[in-house]
Curated annotation (Swiss-Prot):
Catalytic reactions on record: methylamine + L-glutamate + ATP = N(5)-methyl-L-glutamine + ADP + phosphate + H(+)
EC annotation from Swiss-Prot or TrEMBL: 6.3.4.12
SMART domains according to UniProt: Gln-synt_C (SM01230)
High-level lineage: Bacteria, Pseudomonadati, Pseudomonadota, Betaproteobacteria, Nitrosomonadales
One biological process term in Gene Ontology: glutamine biosynthetic process
All copies of domain GS beta-grasp, residue ranges: 13-97
Physiological role: Catalyzes the formation of N(5)-methyl-L-glutamine from glutamate and methylamine.
Annotated source species: Methyloversatilis universalis (strain ATCC BAA-1314 / DSM 25237 / JCM 13912 / CCUG 52030 / FAM5)
Induction (UniProt): Induced during growth on methylamine.
Protein name as it appears in the record: Glutamate--methylamine ligase
Domain GS catalytic: 103-442
Record keywords: ATP-binding, Ligase, Magnesium, Nucleotide-binding
Length: 442
């Protein structure tokens, strides 16, 4: 969108303010509100921020220049739930250059090796979330009647949340995000809204916009829309399954219908999958970045019969118990959860996948058994390893993964520093479970 086209767009839609928006290292949206007549400044010089005040930007309060959020003109859109406002996704710059700690910048750098081959990397995010209300300090599903022990696809649960779901879906559709289905998931108060896949950078921009809208629309209704991976201990958690493929402008390069395994996958797709499997422990840190994330990935079953989360490092066909599923002609990485920074997680996925492609790694045979029912002896016999079972294990794996660290640059060091602090803080916390179990036990 040219500057003149943008100004016309803003005028026609009576936009008064533009949200110059980027994310911190946690994937949380950060903004400044800029009067619409200063649009040109946002896409040239950028909106200025004190970088030290933002998590994970690797900046100091006494030396570094301001963090400048420079707008990507192709992302300018209305904010449907906030009349009179538009949003533009920004790349961080310092000293006139892209800021290497900005995760959108990090993703764009990883995408360069894809585009250099004449390829486009496509992703489709599947955000799961919990729609909740707070009653006397206790979190409950937004719908008091949403109490089924196995609520997946329940009509009543879906229908009674329709005010929120319709408002969010229509907001997304009005700005060109093609919502194609909505369902009630397998936990009480849990939903998923699916929208059409697109190139990886746009997909991450869409997910950020999705979270912004979901939070604000829920708040207007007196509700909480939570992307916490595991808000309830005995129910499935909130994932962010990532479907992926590579195209060359003519065809899907991940698809080969002559595949001997019957998954309709090409050699390129198998090499890519092998890279993801090789780097799975390190990917866990970036795709599942909180202490709560590993309550979702824990080995075991939930009350509904399955956690729907991949505790096992393997791939298969239409097998939802492994880390990678292939619905046919594409890969679905089931590892990420809804708390991840989509830009950083996607960048890590590209680094891992391309390692598999460059070195022609082999993922072995697909695993199509129900791994939730496997014993440890069966897992050992099949050579199937378990994903990290807590954040600390994942961080140690990331520290040792030179491929991922080298590809993503210094932002990984900053991520590790912050997340080790988070782990220590978590370990110091004395939980109600500990008090109830041990206070008078001895």
């Amino acid at each position: 969108m040219s500057p003149s086209e943008a100004q016309q767009f803003l005028k026609e839609n009576q936009v008064k303010y533009i949200l110059a928006q980027f994310v911190d290292i946690h994937g949380s949206a950060k903004t400044k509100s800029v009067p619409a007549e200063h649009y040109k400044t946002v896409v040239t010089d950028g909106a200025g921020f004190a970088g030290f005040a933002i998590w994970g930007m690797g900046m100091t309060p006494n030396v570094d220049a301001d963090y400048m959020a420079v707008g990507d003109a192709s992302t300018l859109s209305l904010v449907p739930w906030q009349p009179g406002y538009a949003r533009i996704a920004c790349d961080g710059h310092t000293h006139g250059k892209p800021h290497e700690y900005d995760t959108r910048v990090v993703l764009k750098k990883q995408l360069e090796q894809i585009t250099a081959r004449g390829w486009t990397f496509f992703t489709g995010m599947e955000p799961e979330f919990s729609l909740l209300r707070k009653v006397e300090g206790k979190l409950l599903p937004a719908d008091p009647g949403d109490t089924l022990s196995k609520p997946c696809y329940d009509y009543k649960g879906l229908s009674r949340a329709r005010v929120f779901l319709e408002r969010l879906s229509e907001s997304l559709r009005s700005v060109g995000i093609d919502v194609y289905q909505i369902d009630h998931e397998d936990a009480n108060g849990q939903f998923e809204i699916n929208y059409t896949f697109t190139d990886a950078l746009t997909s991450c921009d869409h997910y950020t916009f999705f979270k912004m809208g979901a939070a604000e629309i829920a708040a207007e209704l007196g509700l909480i829309c939570s992307f916490m991976p595991k808000p309830f201990s005995n129910r499935p958690g909130n994932g962010l399954h990532m479907h992926m493929s590579i195209g060359d402008g003519k065809r899907n390069l991940f698809e080969d219908k002559s595949d001997k395994h019957g998954l309709a996958l090409s050699k390129l797709a198998y090499h890519w999958a092998a890279g993801l499997l090789k780097h799975a422990p390190a990917l866990a840190a970036l795709c599942c970045p909180t202490v709560n994330s590993y309550k979702r990935l824990v080995v075991g079953r939930s009350l509904t019969g399955a956690t729907w989360a991949p505790a096992y490092i393997c791939y298969g066909g239409n097998n939802r118990s492994g880390m990678i599923r292939s619905p046919g002609g594409r890969l679905e990485l089931r590892l990420p959860d809804a708390s991840c920074n989509a830009y950083l997680a996607t960048a890590a996925v590209i680094a891992a996948g391309m390692d598999g492609v460059i070195n022609e790694l082999d993922p072995g045979a697909p695993q199509n058994d129900n791994l939730y029912e496997y014993s440890q002896a069966q897992l050992d016999a099949a050579g199937i390893k378990v994903l990290p079972q807590n954040l600390h294990e994942a961080l140690l794996a990331l520290e040792k993964d030179e491929v991922i660290r080298s590809a993503l640059g210094p932002v990984v060091d900053e991520f590790l520093r912050l997340k080790h602090m988070e782990w220590v803080e978590y370990m110091r916390h004395v939980s109600d479970w500990e008090v109830n179990s041990y206070l008078e036990f001895f």
